[in-house]
């Protein structure tokens, strides 16, 4: 049987602050024996969909960004699968995405939300 951790977190407008919270949640979940951790929608930002018309371009994250690498490294270092949700930008097009990162730190799946 797989132990799954669900992360509920209070987000701010600071990507770096929310990333630190997310990495700590990965570490905590792994220490508690979870094999998979799931995160809330757009976890690295304030929940901007509730503010229509707001400029959110600064929240875009490229797939090869240090932020994504930090999630991959944390999953690998803690031997846990992780599903972060980010405002990803590929080919100039932003979208809400959940990434499936395996315990080796590799992105093995992606879902547009």
How should these model regions be labeled?
Residues 8-14:
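Short polar catalytic/cofactor-binding loops
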């Amino acid at each position: 049987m797989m132990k799954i951790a669900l992360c509920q977190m209070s987000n701010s407008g600071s990507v770096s602050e929310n990333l630190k919270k997310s990495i700590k949640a990965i570490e905590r979940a792994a220490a508690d024996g979870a094999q998979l951790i799931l995160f809330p929608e757009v976890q690295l930002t304030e929940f901007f969909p509730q503010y229509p018309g707001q400029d959110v371009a600064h929240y875009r994250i490229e797939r090869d960004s240090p932020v994504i690498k930090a999630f991959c490294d944390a999953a690998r270092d803690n031997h846990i699968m992780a599903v972060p949700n980010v405002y990803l930008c590929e080919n100039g097009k932003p979208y809400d995405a959940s990434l499936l990162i395996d315990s080796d730190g590799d992105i093995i799946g992606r879902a547009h939300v």
